[in-house]
């Protein structure tokens, strides 16, 4: 999901319906640009729990799954976006299918870390005080358990491309003025994955969200490193898009998986938003990207 909450009841219904009828109720949903509970009112409110729970309740009302919401709220005014909105990434998850590993959640300025191959705090933000994330949404790591297997899902919304040249604009070659900042964020993410795999080589990782860069970019390469597979990069080239901007289809939304999940993933962008206008019923300006993972032959992991 890529949009700002809280939003009108009509918009909430559109989003909820798309989750139920278009992407068929995934076990875990990454949410992007969730606003705090009073939207753009700049009064110091940072929690977005009511915003997330409003969406979860609407999904249930419409006959969908009974999702739970989890987040770590940002510090006031520190994560970019519209002043007062305090946008953040977060998760919905279906507790009938997956378990959020029960631990104390990290604090807004507390860096996620591993202990004995599992998240020490859950969920937790990745290196939130690092200068690379100044005025940018911090990535959120959450560890889930599915049939005895553990997977760390990392939600991301990297630095905006605002100020970059259009890919097919008048200025050629196009200059990506903001990419250097995203590459630094990407290195932080890859280092985090490396540490998790160093402690627990069987740990599964899935990185999702709006990376604000293309599947072939240096940002994507830095995230993947030698540890991850970029599923969008391996997808049919004609179908590699989740966003439409200035006349071109683009794949800003990607999914990376750890190599121990290679051959066990079915991936697809679901084109229900980017190619349509609001009057045609779209729920967001980004398409959702979806991955199905098969854990049936996974080796049991240490507790």
Go through each PLM region and give its residues:
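Divalent cation-coordinating acidic motifs and surrounding scaffolds
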Residues: 1-301
């Amino acid at each position: 999901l890529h949009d700002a909450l809280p939003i009108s009841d009509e918009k909430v219904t559109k989003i909820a319906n798309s989750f139920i009828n278009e992407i068929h109720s995934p076990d875990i949903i990454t949410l992007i640009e969730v606003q705090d509970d009073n939207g753009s009112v700049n009064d110091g409110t940072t929690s977005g729990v009511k915003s997330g729970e409003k969406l979860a309740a609407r999904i249930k009302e419409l006959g969908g799954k009974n999702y739970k919401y989890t987040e770590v709220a940002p510090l006031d005014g520190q994560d970019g976006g519209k002043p007062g909105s305090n946008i953040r990434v977060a998760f919905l998850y279906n507790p009938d299918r997956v378990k959020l590993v029960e631990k104390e959640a990290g604090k807004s300025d507390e860096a996620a870390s591993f202990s004995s191959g599992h998240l020490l705090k859950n969920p937790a933000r990745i290196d939130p005080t690092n200068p690379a994330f100044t005025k940018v949404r911090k990535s959120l790591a959450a560890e889930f358990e599915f049939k005895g297997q553990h997977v760390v899902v990392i939600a991301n919304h990297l630095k905006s491309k605002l100020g970059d040249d259009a890919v097919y604009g008048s200025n050629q070659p196009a200059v990506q003025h903001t990419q250097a900042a995203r590459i630094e964020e990407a290195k932080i993410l890859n280092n985090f994955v490396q540490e998790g795999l160093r402690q627990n080589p069987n740990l599964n990782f899935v990185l999702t969200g709006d990376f604000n860069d293309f599947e072939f970019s240096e940002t994507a390469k830095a995230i993947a490193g030698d540890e991850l597979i970029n599923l969008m990069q391996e997808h049919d080239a004609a179908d590699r898009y989740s966003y439409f901007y200035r006349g071109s289809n683009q794949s800003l939304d990607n999914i990376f998986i750890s190599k121990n999940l290679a051959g066990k993933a079915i991936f697809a962008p679901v084109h229900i938003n980017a190619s349509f206008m609001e009057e045609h019923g779209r729920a967001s300006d980004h398409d959702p990207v979806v991955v199905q993972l098969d854990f049936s032959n996974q080796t049991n992991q240490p507790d």
